[in-house]
């Protein structure tokens, strides 16, 4: 598949999830997303209204993080926060699973949580992304989560919050994609800091990339394509 520079830009969820992010930081994030035509800004739930207003009239989404970054909230509170974020302008949701229940092998809980979160999103025509936080999981746990997701069908499964002990890994993206196939998309996030990282994740099967280095990556890809005298890059999927 051939990707133009704008195609690459539309894979990027431009991210600022820091606790000390200011209103000026949020405005900068949105301005950059508009300038480079990124797909989404990824922000903490409380910033949903401000960012959605900044992005009004554009095709750039406001993505709210729910139960972030630990996932340690009840299903009811996650659903409430999801609906609240959507009410305040969020039109994509990224939530963190309850890792404690996964470790306890309470797969019914994980499935119920995923289903209720998908329902809360889809009743408002909003995509739902499920964050696994792979750095804390075994390969078998990643596989089990992906199998549950294949059944429940959120819009995306996602590698990481970026706040754990490590971020996205190529082998994890490949594993997740091998299980869900084309039925559920895969988002890679965490530690993706340059164009080589970015391209490696896309080649591995990532359909979306969450990163705070979106501008740097965009500019590096632009330079690479200019130097190679091409207007697109071929990536085998």
Swiss-Prot record:
It holds the Pfam family DeoC. It catalyses: 2-deoxy-D-ribose 5-phosphate = D-glyceraldehyde 3-phosphate + acetaldehyde. It comes from the Bacteria. Its main location: cytoplasm. InterPro entries: Aldolase_TIM, DeoC, DeoC/FbaB/LacD_aldolase, DeoC_typeI. Gene3D superfamilies: Aldolase class I (3.20.20.70). GO terms for molecular function: deoxyribose-phosphate aldolase activity. The active site is at residues 94, 158, 187. CDD domains: DeoC (cd00959). Its EC number is 4.1.2.4. Pathway: Carbohydrate degradation; 2-deoxy-D-ribose 1-phosphate degradation; D-glyceraldehyde 3-phosphate and acetaldehyde from 2-deoxy-alpha-D-ribose 1-phosphate: step 2/2. It is found in: Cytoplasm. NCBIfam families: deoC. Catalyzes a reversible aldol reaction between acetaldehyde and D-glyceraldehyde 3-phosphate to generate 2-deoxy-D-ribose 5-phosphate. Belongs to the DeoC/FbaB aldolase family. DeoC type 1 subfamily. This is Deoxyribose-phosphate aldolase. It comes from Lactobacillus acidophilus (strain ATCC 700396 / NCK56 / N2 / NCFM).
């Amino acid at each position: 598949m051939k990707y133009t520079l704008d195609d690459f830009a539309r894979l990027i969820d431009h991210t600022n999830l820091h606790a000390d992010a200011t209103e000026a930081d949020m405005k900068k994030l949105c301005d950059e997303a508009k300038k480079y035509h990124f797909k989404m800004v990824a922000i903490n739930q409380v910033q949903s209204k401000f960012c959605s207003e900044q992005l009004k009239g554009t095709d750039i989404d406001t993505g709210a993080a729910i139960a972030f970054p630990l996932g340690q909230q009840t299903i009811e509170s996650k659903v409430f926060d999801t609906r609240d974020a959507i009410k305040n302008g969020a039109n994509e949701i990224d939530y963190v699973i309850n890792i404690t229940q996964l470790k306890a092998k309470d797969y019914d809980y994980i499935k119920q949580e995923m289903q209720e979160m998908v329902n809360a999103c889809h009743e408002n025509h909003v995509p739902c992304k499920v964050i696994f936080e792979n750095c804390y999981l075994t390969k078998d746990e990643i596989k089990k989560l992906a199998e549950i997701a294949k059944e429940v069908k959120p819009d995306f499964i996602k590698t990481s919050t970026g706040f754990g002990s490590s971020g996205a890994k190529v082998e994890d993206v490949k594993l997740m994609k091998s299980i869900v196939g084309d039925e559920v998309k895969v988002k890679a996030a965490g530690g993706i800091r340059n164009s080589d990282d970015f391209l490696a994740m896309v080649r591995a099967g990532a359909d979306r990339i969450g990163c705070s280095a979106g501008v740097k990556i965009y500019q590096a890809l632009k330079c690479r394509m200019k130097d190679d005298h091409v207007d697109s890059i071929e990536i085998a999927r």
